[in-house]
A protein has these predicted regions:
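Short glycine-rich, Thr/Ser-proximal phosphate-binding strand/loop in the N-terminal lobe
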Residues: 7, 14-55
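A short acidic Gly-Thr/Ser loop motif
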Residues: 10-16, 89, 162-167, 186, ...
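Glycine-rich phosphate-binding loops at beta-strand->alpha-helix junctions
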Residues: 16, 273-291, 309
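Glycine-rich phosphate-binding loop plus the immediately following alpha-helix
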Residues: 38-52, 132-223
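Short beta-strand-loop/turn "lid" adjacent to the catalytic site in phosphate-handling enzymes
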Residues: 48-53, 69-115, 129-137
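Short glycine-rich phosphate-binding loop at a beta-alpha junction
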Residues: 78-90, 165, 260, 272-281
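Adenine-nucleotide phosphate-binding core of ATP-dependent small-molecule kinases
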Residues: 223-266
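Glycine-rich phosphate-binding/hydrolytic loop that grips phosphoryl groups
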Residues: 265, 302-325
Length: 325
């Protein structure tokens, strides 16, 4: 890939697209653009075009070009010949090109991840590097593997990396290798329960998670998630309102805490592991609060927190360096 001193970092998820112009020295973000045109929506648009399969890559590349043009306008200069590094769902069966998963174990430095390079063309003047996902016996991920390889100050010994989200990941690391991971549908369950179930009328999103009452409700939900059966305790979100125990906004945070607590129950016995959480600010605050309660109840270690946006950029930069070797 051409070494321009910069690269375009593309994090293309199922429901979101984020593009950043990154200076390689110091990994400084120079400009950025984002849209809700995730892979799922882009794939739907592609299917409507009814074009031959061999045109799919070019169609997706045109969508990237629209966002590159916004970066060009922000910076006042051409982005031609600056490489594009893509992680996320672009390598899935609804993405630009389907790439196989890398079977675990894989190295934390990302040197054995599966990646595919595409040379610049007349119509898309950027070398492209697409990073594929990883798979275990029962689980898969696309995108999180790049965050894992971008973790700073990697703990020594055995440790667990938690990546919160729609489908949270708990990743086990031994001797510099990812050896196992599990998927927890925490975010998706919250979405379903709060919008599609009988609980929907009992929930109202609060504007301030740091509000004293909201935080108290969240912590109570965490304890309930750790200590009780989820299939029973989730119904309490309804009786919280029927019996005037919580407001609808407080109940929103109670239910969120309940599901996070249920997810993290898996970790109550892992006292010998260091724990790293990689997420956005809201996720880090929520999971930090949950682990403080876990520490009180089960002596689970307090985790180290790392920003997911920075981890993505570091992981993509390392992938680009590995590709040059």
């Amino acid at each position: 890939m051409h070494d321009q001193g910069e690269f375009l970092s593309c994090d293309w998820g199922t429901s979101s697209f984020r593009l950043k112009l990154v200076k390689i020295a110091g990994l400084e973000i120079i400009a950025e653009s984002s849209t809700t045109n995730g892979i799922a929506r882009t794939y739907e648009l592609w299917k409507r075009m009814n074009e031959p399969e061999e045109n799919r890559f070019a169609f997706y590349a045109r969508n990237i070009s629209h966002q590159i043009e916004k970066i060009s306008q922000q910076t006042g200069r051409s982005m031609d010949n600056i490489p594009v590094i893509i992680s996320g769902m672009a390598s899935s069966n609804i993405g630009m090109i389907e790439l196989p998963y890398k079977k675990i174990p894989f190295k934390l430095n990302g040197s054995d991840l599966l990646m595919q390079r595409y040379a610049a063309t007349e119509n898309f003047k950027h070398d492209v590097l697409i990073i594929s996902g990883i798979s275990g016996d029962q689980d898969v991920m696309r995108g999180e593997e790049t965050q894992i390889t971008g973790i700073e100050n990697i703990p020594s010994g055995d440790w667990i990396c938690i990546l919160p989200g729609t489908h949270s990941k708990h990743v086990k690391v031994k001797n510099g290798l990812v050896v196992d991971f599990k998927t927890f549908m925490t975010g998706e369950f919250f979405e379903l329960l709060s919008t599609k179930s009988i609980l929907a009328g009992s929930i109202e999103k609060g504007a301030d998670p740091a509000n004293k009452n909201n935080l108290s409700a969240f912590e109570k939900g965490i304890r309930a998630g750790i200590e009780s059966n989820l299939l029973h305790s989730s119904f309490i979100a309804r009786t919280n309102i029927l019996f005037n125990k919580l407001s609808r906004q407080e109940n929103y945070y109670w239910l969120s805490g309940l599901l996070i607590g249920a997810e993290l129950t898996e970790l109550t016995h892992l006292h010998e592991y260091n724990i790293v959480i990689v997420g956005n600010q809201e996720q880090l605050l929520s999971y930090k609060a949950a682990f403080e309660i876990l520490n009180q109840l089960a002596k689970t270690p307090i985790p180290v927190l790392q920003d997911s946006d920075k981890a993505i950029i570091r992981g993509q930069s390392r992938a680009m360096m590995n590709q040059k070797k």
